[in-house]
Amino acid sequence: MEFISSDYCTKDNDNEEESLLANVASLRHELKITEWSLHNLGEELSSVSPSENSEYVCSPSRSERLILEELTQPSHLGRLIYPPYKKVCKTSDSTDYQKKSRDQVSFSSVSMDQEVKNLREKLHKLRQQNACLVTQNHSLMTKIESVHFELTQSKAKIAMLESAQEQAANIPILEEQIINLEAEVSAQDKVLREAEDKLEQSQKMVIEKEHSLQEAKEECIKLKVDLLEQSKQGKRAERQRNEALYNAEELSKAFQLYKEKVAEKLEKVQDEEEILERNLSNCEKENKRLQEKCNLYKSELEILKEKFRELKEEHYSGKEKLMIMAMKNSEVMSQLTESRQCILKLERELEDKDEIVREKFSLLNENRELKVRVATQNERLELCQQDIDNSRVELKSLEKLITQIPLKREIVGFRSSLCKHQRSSVSDKEDKCIGCCEANKLMISELRIKLAIREAEIQKLHANLTVNQLSQNVANDSQECGKVNTLETEPVKLGGSQVESIKDGDQQTVNKQYEREKQRLATGIEELRAKLTQIEAENSDLKVNMAHRTSQFQLIQEELLEKASNASKLENEMTKKCSQLLILEKQLEEKIIAYSSIAAKNAELEQELMEKNEKIRSLESNINTEHEKICFAFEKAKKIHLEQHKEMEKQIEQLETQLEKRDQQFKEQEKTMSILQQDILCKQHHLESLDRLLTESKVEMEKENMKKDEALKALQIHVSEETIKVRQLDSALEICKEELALHLNQLERNKEKFERQLKKKSEEVYCLQKELKIKTHNLEETSEQNAILQHTLQQQQQMLQQETMRNGELEDTQSKLEKQVSKQEQELQKQRESSTEKLRKMEEKYETAIREVDLKRQKIIELTGTARQAKLEMDQYKEELSKMEKEIIHLKRDGENKSMQLSQLDMVLDQTKTELEKTTNSVKELERLQHHTETELTETMQKREALENELQNAHGELKSTLRQLQELRDVLQKAQLSLEEKYTTIKDLTAELRECKMEIEDKKQELIEMDQALKERNWELKQRAAQVTHLDMTIREHRGEMEQKIIKLEGTLEKSELELKECNKQVESLNEKLQNAKEQLREKEFIMLQNEQEISQLKKEIERTQQRMKEMESVIKEQEDYIATQYKEVIDLGQELRLTQEQMQNTHSELVEARRQEVQAQREIERLAGELEDIKQLSKEKEAHGNRLAEELGASQVREAHLEARMQAEIKKLSSEVDSLKEAYQIEMISHQENHAKWKLSAESQKTSVQQLNEQLEKAKQELEEAQDTVSNLHQQVQDRNEVIEAANEALLIKESELTRLQAKISGHEKTEDTKYLPAPFTTLTEIIPDSQHPNFAKHSQISLFKCRKLRRSISASDLSFKSHGNDDLSEELLQDLKKMQFEQTSAIESGHKDLPLTHSESFKPLPYNLEDDSSESNDFSTLSGMLRYINKEVRLLKKSSLQTATGLSQGGKL
């Protein structure tokens, strides 16, 4: 049996040694691979600079590719996955992605800081990874040393066994030691396998980190491109800002010029008012003069009345004479009609005779033409005779040839052809003669028609002539036709003598007829001459009569000339007055031209403003597009964040599944432990049976000593072989140590290179900080410029207010002047009514005179008609009469025009009355609005005072709350306090930004209202100026008309004098009222100035309160510094926190009441409402801080890193928002200046502004209600989160207690086992090992902190998505998971209490040490160096925690 057991032991030892050698070889190979990869990574990181990232990304090295290929082999990767590393990688990826999205959103210089921070974080991650690898290497070295130590122990044990084999009783002890050695070897195998798994995992991590490095480099390239684009955009924005500032300066200059122009216009208006006053004084003087003239005219009227009576008498006598003259005229007219008839007859006869003479002359010309034609016909006849002679000769020759019979036919044909030719020639001649005769007949017929129309006697003569002519023509035609016929029938028989005799006879008959006609015409002419002499005698008689009548006409004309002279005098006076009117019209036209030029300039300025508004709109549209892009990117980031959140949830689920698997594994290990215990019990029973067998076998042992000696020799041989193998392993281990030393030297060199790179990057960070300081300085300068611009705007507003006051004064003066004008118009109406009555009477008289003149005119027209027809000498008289008639027509037209003017003036007066009524109504409405506004101002002042009191009370309450918060903040550490300070500063910035936005909106609304008011006022001023000019025109026309009417009218002047005196009295009273009104307006202006001064004082007080708040915040910072020293008093302050919470609740109830009051105040004033909303938000935030501070005392260290990242992101966002708001503010300032230039075109829009204010108040109410709802929802979410945090804290505390107890149990078990199985000399090692492990156990408690930190980070990550919709579901899931954990932990605690109780204070011993270490260091988050120090601290803690986890896992494997 012993031999078999020894063989079995030798075989097992051989197998174990072979497995150990194989494991060592694989470990060496993997260590070489990892060291080679680390060496390559170090060289690449040292060689690659930030500018060469793109080249590295584009061309990776061959060594890196080989390492990746070697590391990605399936033999090295294996099946294992390291879940915590996955978690870390995913969280880092998610944070990197979030940072990417944020970098894409931000368009400011903070992106450089983000890049530096990202690079720093990546470097820290690489360092962590390198540190993990180094720690793994160290752990492997320690394990190898422990294996070597165990081998030495085994050698010692073997020696002990050799010494013990001499004694037969020590064999079971050796067997037990062999069993222990086998267990230790199996544990070492497990450790080596775990080391292999870790190496594989480290290789995977290296691969993943290489991928992450490549991605980081690509991201750096992308970020550089983005930075270039952002820098370009920033330059463009700066250019646009500079252009906008330049435009603003130009607009301010234009605005100043416009102010000067408006001031000049106002001066001109004042000058015109003075001129009008002077004109009124001149009018009064003129009225006095006119009264004097009226007195003179009265005297003249009396004289004229007497003359008028005389003229009436003369008129009556003249009427009688006129009647006589009319009788004579009627007789003369009858004679004239008779003479006209005679003259018409004579003229007709003369015309007829003249026509007869003309016809005779035409006949003579026709005879001459006929003679010429006859001569031509004679010549043709001679030619015909020659032809006949020739034909005769030919006939003779033909007669000779008749004898020849065969030629008869030819002769006959020839004759026929000749006859035809002759006939054709004769027919042509006849046609020509017939055409001439026809033309003569037509002329004669026309003459007949004319003569038959005019006179019967001449018709007879014409009839005789035509009969003679026709008879002659017929005879001629018949003769010619007879001749032709005879020629045709008998051409051969005619001779030359006969033709000549015929022609002579024809000529003689024609001459006789012409002589007869001449005699007849001569007799007719003599008769006509006799008639002409008779007519001339009659004309001479008529001339004598006409001379008598012309003398009578001359007398009448002289009378008319006298009347015309009087009329010309009147016309001269009218022309003088018309000239005056023209001068006044010219002046009015000049003023109208001036006003039109001013209006044109205004229109040009308006067009320029419109163009600039269009530019601003285009810029606003560009800004809106960019804002939409940013919103779109922000929405994308939100979506990505939600996706990441979902991925994190999935990861959490995976981790939960892994935890469940781990729990299952733990349970399985417990089962295995129970099985092992059972095996131990079985082995103990077996040992007892072996003892029995040993007692029985002692007898047999003596027999088998020889066999054992042989077995001992075999064992010695085996031991010698094992010693050889151990020596080989020692040599291999020494080689490994040398290689590890080389690799460690290389790692140190890499560390030095990393430190150099860090120094360089720290220098770059320092440069960036300087640039940031410069930019902040520039921003401060821009803010100062904005403040200066605001000051200038306030000054311009004051100037505008003064101008509005002046405009109000001018309007009041205009209203008073209009009242005076209305009174004067009433007086003029009365005068017009009286004058219209007199005019009607005069017009009736005038109409009677016009009728008489019309009758005379008709008679004169008849006389002139007869005179024109009678002689040419009367034409002069006719022209004179026509001139007189034209003058009378002009007089009529003038009368009609005057009547039309009077009607137009009546219409204008009606229009002016309606306009004056409208103006009076508008003035009344304005006065009412003024009273209403004054009452509203008083009410607002009272409300302001009440609100200021409430603000002071609120400030006092806030001070008390601040003191309480100081006591609460004493609990927290410096890092969290600094973060909260930043958070509060950010919220203050947001509140200030909101206040700025509200103030800008208020200013915009005020500007819009003032613009509208100024536009309406300018429009009304223009209308009123037009009305004034129109009134000036009407007044001047009235003056002209009144002057004309004063000449005609008599009794109205006395009444007008009395009315003018009354008007003067009224004017004096109105002047006194004007002075009183001016004094009242001055008093009102003084009151308004006082109110403005009070408002400025209130603003200063508000600024002082803000400064005090800042000072209080600085005091809070100092007290927060003092908090770090008083951290040990946290436990005592727990009760005080509860009291403060109750006080905060009371203050919260008081603040709710204050909010209600603020809501009421917001309905009245929007500015104070914004301030009160800010106070509410601050109070709410501080309450939330108090609750969080009370609830998050135990989790302060865990949330620091996450809050820093969060606050930095928020600071970047807010800084970008601040930049965007500054740009928007600059744009709004530009638009404000442009709108300020438009201010002077608006007036009286208070009704619309009141409606707008009411609508805005309703909107503000709705927004406040929505904000209150959101605040209540946020409170609920915070409470839910606080519950989740409390549950997590409790669960973590329970886990930490469990872990410490389990560690104590394990340490106790190890101590007991070491004391059992090892002898006295080897107990020192077992004592040394727990001593070395005891700090690990103490540090193992930090593993729980690390886990707790992870949990808190997950919670804070969920806090980042504070506005996500899935928060409620997450909180519910977390609560359920924590409840499960609590249930499991309570069961574990109960089992732990049964096994080994341990105090709670021992588990928390390492915590205060770490806290003191953390608190001893100063965390300056205001600078990048302080933040980097803090990050390095956390990295070290993470390294320590990872080392502790590794040691804990190794100890668990050993157990």
Curated annotation (Swiss-Prot):
GO terms for cellular component: centriolar satellite; cytoplasm. It is found in: Cytoplasm, Cytoskeleton, Microtubule organizing center, Centrosome, Centriolar satellite. Residues 799-840 are annotated as: Disordered. Residues 806-840 have a biased composition (Basic and acidic residues). The modification Phosphoserine is found at S47, S1356. Its main location: cytoplasm. Keywords: Coiled coil, Cytoplasm, Cytoskeleton, Phosphoprotein. Residues 108-405, 441-473 form a coiled coil. This is Coiled-coil domain-containing protein 18. It comes from Mus musculus (Mouse).
